[in-house]
Amino acid sequence: MDAFDAIPDPVVIDILNRVGDVKTLIRCRSVSKRFNSLATQSESLLLQLDQILGATESDSEIDSPIASFFRSLFKSIHGLLPPIFSKPANSDEILTRSPKTPAQILSGFERIRNLEVELYGGDVKLEKGAAVKWKAEFGKTLKSCVIVAFRSATVNTSAATEAAAVVDGVVESDSEFVCGLKTRVVWTISALMAASTRHYLMRDLVKDHKEMEKLIVRDSDGEGTVVMDAAGMKEYRETEVRGDNKESERVGERTVVPSVRMSMRHAPSLMLKSGICLEAATLVVVRPTGVASDDNDVELVTEAFAGDGDDCMYGEAVTALLKRRRNVLEMNSF
Protein backbone atom coordinates (compact mmCIF):
# COMPACT_ATOMS: atom_id res chain seq x y z
CA MET A 1 0.00 0.00 0.00
CA ASP A 2 1.43 3.40 -0.99
CA ALA A 3 0.94 6.74 0.78
CA PHE A 4 -1.96 7.67 -1.45
CA ASP A 5 -3.90 4.54 -0.48
CA ALA A 6 -3.56 5.58 3.16
CA ILE A 7 -5.68 8.70 2.59
CA PRO A 8 -9.17 8.05 4.03
CA ASP A 9 -12.05 7.86 1.56
CA PRO A 10 -13.90 10.89 3.06
CA VAL A 11 -10.82 13.06 2.44
CA VAL A 12 -10.54 11.92 -1.17
CA ILE A 13 -14.26 12.51 -1.72
CA ASP A 14 -13.95 16.01 -0.27
CA ILE A 15 -11.11 16.75 -2.70
CA LEU A 16 -13.17 15.41 -5.61
CA ASN A 17 -16.09 17.60 -4.53
CA ARG A 18 -13.79 20.60 -4.82
CA VAL A 19 -12.86 19.52 -8.35
CA GLY A 20 -16.52 19.39 -9.36
CA ASP A 21 -15.94 19.39 -13.13
CA VAL A 22 -17.56 16.29 -14.64
CA LYS A 23 -14.99 15.94 -17.41
CA THR A 24 -12.17 15.82 -14.87
CA LEU A 25 -14.06 13.39 -12.64
CA ILE A 26 -14.59 11.03 -15.57
CA ARG A 27 -10.82 10.96 -15.91
CA CYS A 28 -10.52 10.34 -12.18
CA ARG A 29 -12.71 7.27 -12.61
CA SER A 30 -10.32 5.87 -15.20
CA VAL A 31 -7.27 5.96 -12.90
CA SER A 32 -8.05 3.02 -10.64
CA LYS A 33 -10.85 0.94 -9.20
CA ARG A 34 -10.76 3.02 -6.03
CA PHE A 35 -11.08 6.30 -7.90
CA ASN A 36 -13.80 4.84 -10.09
CA SER A 37 -15.79 4.13 -6.94
CA LEU A 38 -15.10 7.39 -5.10
CA ALA A 39 -15.54 9.80 -8.00
CA THR A 40 -19.14 8.69 -8.43
CA GLN A 41 -19.84 9.79 -4.85
CA SER A 42 -19.11 13.45 -5.59
CA GLU A 43 -21.99 15.60 -4.35
CA SER A 44 -21.30 18.94 -6.09
CA LEU A 45 -20.86 18.82 -9.86
CA LEU A 46 -20.37 21.18 -12.78
CA LEU A 47 -21.43 19.77 -16.15
CA GLN A 48 -20.22 21.85 -19.10
CA LEU A 49 -22.06 20.43 -22.07
CA ASP A 50 -19.84 22.10 -24.66
CA GLN A 51 -16.89 20.15 -23.25
CA ILE A 52 -18.68 16.82 -23.08
CA LEU A 53 -20.47 17.01 -26.41
CA GLY A 54 -17.80 16.89 -29.05
CA ALA A 55 -15.31 19.41 -27.67
CA THR A 56 -11.64 18.52 -27.86
CA GLU A 57 -8.78 19.03 -25.46
CA SER A 58 -7.55 21.94 -27.57
CA ASP A 59 -10.82 23.83 -27.19
CA SER A 60 -10.74 26.83 -24.90
CA GLU A 61 -11.82 25.85 -21.41
CA ILE A 62 -11.46 27.40 -17.99
CA ASP A 63 -10.28 24.98 -15.31
CA SER A 64 -9.84 25.56 -11.61
CA PRO A 65 -6.31 25.10 -10.22
CA ILE A 66 -7.45 21.90 -8.51
CA ALA A 67 -8.84 20.48 -11.75
CA SER A 68 -5.61 21.36 -13.59
CA PHE A 69 -3.57 19.69 -10.87
CA PHE A 70 -5.58 16.48 -11.10
CA ARG A 71 -5.30 16.42 -14.89
CA SER A 72 -1.50 16.72 -14.70
CA LEU A 73 -1.28 14.14 -11.93
CA PHE A 74 -3.37 11.53 -13.73
CA LYS A 75 -1.52 12.00 -17.01
CA SER A 76 1.75 11.44 -15.15
CA ILE A 77 0.76 8.26 -13.35
CA HIS A 78 -1.32 6.78 -16.15
CA GLY A 79 1.75 5.22 -17.79
CA LEU A 80 2.74 3.58 -14.50
CA LEU A 81 -0.55 1.74 -14.04
CA PRO A 82 -0.66 -2.03 -14.64
CA PRO A 83 -2.30 -3.34 -17.83
CA ILE A 84 -5.51 -4.21 -15.97
CA PHE A 85 -6.25 -0.48 -15.74
CA SER A 86 -4.73 0.63 -19.04
CA LYS A 87 -7.62 -0.13 -21.34
CA PRO A 88 -10.46 1.59 -19.45
CA ALA A 89 -8.20 4.52 -18.56
CA ASN A 90 -8.56 6.20 -21.97
CA SER A 91 -10.69 9.16 -20.90
CA ASP A 92 -10.84 10.57 -24.43
CA GLU A 93 -12.57 7.39 -25.56
CA ILE A 94 -14.97 7.66 -22.64
CA LEU A 95 -15.83 11.24 -23.54
CA THR A 96 -16.16 10.43 -27.24
CA ARG A 97 -18.67 7.69 -26.64
CA SER A 98 -20.49 9.63 -23.92
CA PRO A 99 -24.27 9.82 -24.50
CA LYS A 100 -25.72 13.14 -25.50
CA THR A 101 -28.20 13.86 -22.71
CA PRO A 102 -27.25 15.22 -19.26
CA ALA A 103 -29.08 12.32 -17.58
CA GLN A 104 -27.03 9.73 -19.46
CA ILE A 105 -23.75 11.56 -18.91
CA LEU A 106 -24.35 11.64 -15.15
CA SER A 107 -25.90 8.19 -14.84
CA GLY A 108 -22.85 6.82 -13.00
CA PHE A 109 -22.91 9.49 -10.28
CA GLU A 110 -24.83 8.29 -7.24
CA ARG A 111 -24.93 11.12 -4.70
CA ILE A 112 -25.47 14.39 -6.54
CA ARG A 113 -26.70 17.11 -4.18
CA ASN A 114 -25.86 20.28 -6.06
CA LEU A 115 -25.59 20.34 -9.84
CA GLU A 116 -24.70 23.23 -12.10
CA VAL A 117 -25.12 22.72 -15.83
CA GLU A 118 -23.45 25.16 -18.20
CA LEU A 119 -24.75 25.28 -21.76
CA TYR A 120 -22.69 26.37 -24.75
CA GLY A 121 -24.31 29.79 -25.18
CA GLY A 122 -27.44 31.89 -24.87
CA ASP A 123 -30.73 31.12 -26.61
CA VAL A 124 -32.34 34.51 -27.22
CA LYS A 125 -31.62 36.00 -30.64
CA LEU A 126 -31.63 39.81 -30.57
CA GLU A 127 -30.83 42.73 -32.77
CA LYS A 128 -27.25 43.97 -32.62
CA GLY A 129 -26.47 45.83 -29.41
CA ALA A 130 -29.51 44.55 -27.51
CA ALA A 131 -29.20 42.37 -24.42
CA VAL A 132 -31.53 40.22 -22.34
CA LYS A 133 -30.73 38.70 -18.97
CA TRP A 134 -33.18 36.47 -17.10
CA LYS A 135 -33.60 34.11 -14.18
CA ALA A 136 -36.44 31.59 -13.94
CA GLU A 137 -37.54 29.21 -11.20
CA PHE A 138 -39.35 26.00 -12.02
CA GLY A 139 -41.16 23.19 -10.26
CA LYS A 140 -43.49 21.04 -12.35
CA THR A 141 -43.90 24.19 -14.43
CA LEU A 142 -42.84 27.85 -14.35
CA LYS A 143 -42.96 29.48 -10.91
CA SER A 144 -41.43 32.85 -11.72
CA CYS A 145 -39.17 34.58 -14.20
CA VAL A 146 -37.40 37.93 -13.91
CA ILE A 147 -36.21 39.54 -17.13
CA VAL A 148 -34.16 42.68 -17.70
CA ALA A 149 -33.44 43.89 -21.23
CA PHE A 150 -32.34 46.92 -23.19
CA ARG A 151 -31.84 47.85 -26.83
CA SER A 152 -28.39 49.41 -26.47
CA ALA A 153 -25.90 50.59 -23.87
CA THR A 154 -23.58 53.58 -24.18
CA VAL A 155 -21.17 55.22 -21.76
CA ASN A 156 -21.62 58.89 -20.92
CA THR A 157 -19.80 60.04 -17.79
CA SER A 158 -20.78 63.71 -18.01
CA ALA A 159 -23.34 64.68 -15.40
CA ALA A 160 -24.31 61.04 -15.04
CA THR A 161 -25.46 61.33 -11.46
CA GLU A 162 -27.73 64.30 -12.12
CA ALA A 163 -29.20 62.70 -15.24
CA ALA A 164 -29.90 59.48 -13.39
CA ALA A 165 -31.72 61.36 -10.66
CA VAL A 166 -33.88 63.16 -13.20
CA VAL A 167 -34.78 59.98 -15.09
CA ASP A 168 -35.69 58.16 -11.87
CA GLY A 169 -38.22 60.85 -11.05
CA VAL A 170 -40.01 60.80 -14.41
CA VAL A 171 -43.53 59.36 -14.52
CA GLU A 172 -43.99 57.44 -17.75
CA SER A 173 -47.06 58.28 -19.82
CA ASP A 174 -49.32 55.68 -21.44
CA SER A 175 -48.09 56.65 -24.90
CA GLU A 176 -44.47 56.17 -23.83
CA PHE A 177 -45.28 52.72 -22.48
CA VAL A 178 -47.10 51.63 -25.65
CA CYS A 179 -44.21 52.78 -27.82
CA GLY A 180 -41.95 49.76 -28.31
CA LEU A 181 -44.31 47.43 -26.41
CA LYS A 182 -44.20 44.82 -29.18
CA THR A 183 -40.42 44.55 -28.88
CA ARG A 184 -40.58 44.19 -25.11
CA VAL A 185 -43.19 41.44 -25.39
CA VAL A 186 -41.01 39.62 -27.93
CA TRP A 187 -38.07 39.83 -25.51
CA THR A 188 -40.25 38.38 -22.77
CA ILE A 189 -41.60 35.52 -24.88
CA SER A 190 -38.10 34.67 -26.13
CA ALA A 191 -36.76 34.47 -22.57
CA LEU A 192 -39.69 32.31 -21.42
CA MET A 193 -39.22 29.93 -24.35
CA ALA A 194 -35.50 29.64 -23.60
CA ALA A 195 -36.24 28.92 -19.93
CA SER A 196 -38.88 26.29 -20.71
CA THR A 197 -36.52 24.59 -23.18
CA ARG A 198 -33.86 24.25 -20.49
CA HIS A 199 -36.43 22.91 -18.04
CA TYR A 200 -37.44 20.26 -20.57
CA LEU A 201 -33.79 19.33 -21.18
CA MET A 202 -33.36 18.49 -17.48
CA ARG A 203 -36.51 16.33 -17.17
CA ASP A 204 -34.82 12.90 -17.07
CA LEU A 205 -32.02 14.16 -14.85
CA VAL A 206 -34.50 15.41 -12.26
CA LYS A 207 -36.45 12.14 -12.34
CA ASP A 208 -33.36 9.93 -12.04
CA HIS A 209 -31.51 11.77 -9.26
CA LYS A 210 -33.95 11.98 -6.38
CA GLU A 211 -31.13 12.96 -4.03
CA MET A 212 -30.60 16.35 -5.72
CA GLU A 213 -31.25 19.45 -3.61
CA LYS A 214 -30.43 22.20 -6.09
CA LEU A 215 -30.16 22.40 -9.87
CA ILE A 216 -28.87 25.43 -11.76
CA VAL A 217 -28.84 25.58 -15.56
CA ARG A 218 -26.99 28.54 -17.04
CA ASP A 219 -25.13 29.38 -20.22
CA SER A 220 -21.54 30.44 -20.84
CA ASP A 221 -22.72 33.84 -22.10
CA GLY A 222 -24.40 34.64 -18.77
CA GLU A 223 -27.72 35.29 -20.50
CA GLY A 224 -30.15 33.17 -18.53
CA THR A 225 -30.44 30.90 -15.51
CA VAL A 226 -32.97 28.21 -14.62
CA VAL A 227 -33.18 27.20 -10.96
CA MET A 228 -34.93 24.25 -9.33
CA ASP A 229 -34.77 23.67 -5.59
CA ALA A 230 -35.49 20.43 -3.74
CA ALA A 231 -39.20 21.22 -3.34
CA GLY A 232 -39.56 22.11 -7.01
CA MET A 233 -37.88 18.90 -8.17
CA LYS A 234 -40.02 16.83 -5.81
CA GLU A 235 -43.13 18.51 -7.20
CA TYR A 236 -42.01 17.69 -10.74
CA ARG A 237 -41.37 14.01 -9.94
CA GLU A 238 -44.71 13.60 -8.21
CA THR A 239 -46.48 15.11 -11.21
CA GLU A 240 -44.71 12.68 -13.52
CA VAL A 241 -45.55 9.69 -11.31
CA ARG A 242 -49.24 10.63 -11.25
CA GLY A 243 -49.19 11.10 -14.99
CA ASP A 244 -50.78 14.51 -14.49
CA ASN A 245 -49.83 16.28 -17.70
CA LYS A 246 -52.22 19.17 -17.33
CA GLU A 247 -49.61 21.49 -15.84
CA SER A 248 -46.44 19.85 -17.17
CA GLU A 249 -47.35 19.06 -20.75
CA ARG A 250 -44.78 19.51 -23.49
CA VAL A 251 -44.78 21.23 -26.82
CA GLY A 252 -41.95 20.38 -29.17
CA GLU A 253 -38.76 20.24 -27.13
CA ARG A 254 -39.83 22.47 -24.25
CA THR A 255 -42.21 22.66 -21.32
CA VAL A 256 -45.45 24.54 -21.94
CA VAL A 257 -45.46 28.02 -20.40
CA PRO A 258 -48.68 28.48 -18.37
CA SER A 259 -50.93 31.53 -18.57
CA VAL A 260 -49.01 34.33 -16.88
CA ARG A 261 -49.25 37.85 -15.49
CA MET A 262 -46.41 40.18 -16.41
CA SER A 263 -45.42 43.17 -14.28
CA MET A 264 -43.57 45.35 -16.76
CA ARG A 265 -41.54 48.48 -16.02
CA HIS A 266 -39.91 50.52 -18.75
CA ALA A 267 -37.69 53.54 -19.29
CA PRO A 268 -37.16 54.92 -22.83
CA SER A 269 -33.70 56.06 -21.73
CA LEU A 270 -32.19 55.11 -18.38
CA MET A 271 -29.01 56.85 -17.24
CA LEU A 272 -27.29 54.91 -14.48
CA LYS A 273 -25.09 56.49 -11.83
CA SER A 274 -22.17 54.54 -13.28
CA GLY A 275 -22.46 56.64 -16.45
CA ILE A 276 -24.03 53.92 -18.61
CA CYS A 277 -27.11 54.91 -20.59
CA LEU A 278 -29.55 52.10 -21.43
CA GLU A 279 -32.00 52.65 -24.26
CA ALA A 280 -35.43 51.00 -23.96
CA ALA A 281 -34.54 49.58 -20.54
CA THR A 282 -37.14 47.01 -19.48
CA LEU A 283 -37.83 44.99 -16.35
CA VAL A 284 -40.42 42.21 -16.42
CA VAL A 285 -41.54 40.00 -13.54
CA VAL A 286 -43.51 36.97 -14.75
CA ARG A 287 -45.68 34.71 -12.59
CA PRO A 288 -48.37 32.17 -13.42
CA THR A 289 -51.88 33.62 -13.38
CA GLY A 290 -53.54 33.23 -10.00
CA VAL A 291 -50.38 33.30 -7.89
CA ALA A 292 -51.15 35.20 -4.69
CA SER A 293 -47.70 36.78 -4.15
CA ASP A 294 -48.12 39.24 -6.99
CA ASP A 295 -46.85 42.31 -5.13
CA ASN A 296 -43.40 41.21 -3.96
CA ASP A 297 -41.62 42.24 -7.15
CA VAL A 298 -38.85 43.96 -5.21
CA GLU A 299 -37.88 40.83 -3.29
CA LEU A 300 -37.95 38.62 -6.37
CA VAL A 301 -35.98 41.06 -8.53
CA THR A 302 -33.42 41.77 -5.83
CA GLU A 303 -32.78 38.07 -5.37
CA ALA A 304 -32.34 37.61 -9.12
CA PHE A 305 -30.13 40.58 -9.99
CA ALA A 306 -29.50 43.35 -7.49
CA GLY A 307 -27.28 41.23 -5.27
CA ASP A 308 -25.12 40.00 -8.16
CA GLY A 309 -21.74 41.64 -7.70
CA ASP A 310 -20.48 40.37 -11.07
CA ASP A 311 -23.25 42.18 -12.94
CA CYS A 312 -23.39 45.54 -11.15
CA MET A 313 -24.83 47.22 -14.25
CA TYR A 314 -27.87 44.94 -14.16
CA GLY A 315 -28.21 45.37 -10.42
CA GLU A 316 -28.15 49.16 -10.75
CA ALA A 317 -30.57 49.03 -13.69
CA VAL A 318 -33.21 46.94 -11.91
CA THR A 319 -32.95 49.10 -8.80
CA ALA A 320 -33.73 52.16 -10.93
CA LEU A 321 -36.46 50.40 -12.94
CA LEU A 322 -38.25 49.29 -9.76
CA LYS A 323 -39.00 52.98 -9.16
CA ARG A 324 -40.85 53.22 -12.46
CA ARG A 325 -44.58 52.71 -12.92
CA ARG A 326 -45.70 49.10 -13.04
CA ASN A 327 -47.89 48.01 -15.95
CA VAL A 328 -49.62 44.64 -15.71
CA LEU A 329 -50.24 42.50 -18.78
CA GLU A 330 -51.58 38.98 -19.15
CA MET A 331 -50.59 36.32 -21.64
CA ASN A 332 -52.17 32.97 -22.48
CA SER A 333 -50.36 29.66 -22.22
CA PHE A 334 -48.08 28.79 -25.12
Swiss-Prot record:
GO CC term, one of those recorded: nucleus
Residue stretches making up the F-box domain: 1-49
Pathway this chain belongs to: Protein modification; protein ubiquitination
Gene3D superfamilies referenced in this protein's UniProt entry, alphabetically: 1.20.1280.50
Induction of its expression: Induced by auxin.
UniProt keyword list: Nucleus, Ubl conjugation pathway
Domain of life, per lineage: Eukaryota
Disulfide bridges in this chain: none
Record InterPro entries: AUF1-like (IPR044809), F-box-like_dom_sf (IPR036047), F-box_dom (IPR001810)
Entry's Gene Ontology BP terms: acropetal auxin transport; basipetal auxin transport; cytokinin-activated signaling pathway; protein ubiquitination
A Pfam family annotated for this UniProt entry: F-box-like
Subcellular location: Nucleus
Quaternary structure and interacting proteins, as annotated: Part of a SCF (ASK-cullin-F-box) protein ligase complex. Interacts with SKP1A/ASK1, SKP1B/ASK2, ASK11 and ASK13.
Free-text comment about domains: The F-box is necessary for the interaction with ASK proteins.
Its job: Component of SCF(ASK-cullin-F-box) E3 ubiquitin ligase complexes, which may mediate the ubiquitination and subsequent proteasomal degradation of target proteins. Involved in the control of basipetal and acropetal auxin transport by promoting the distribution and expression of the auxin transporter PIN2. Promotes cytokinin-mediated cell expansion in the root elongation and differentiation zone, without affecting root cell division.
Name the record gives this protein: F-box protein AUF1
Species: Arabidopsis thaliana (Mouse-ear cress)
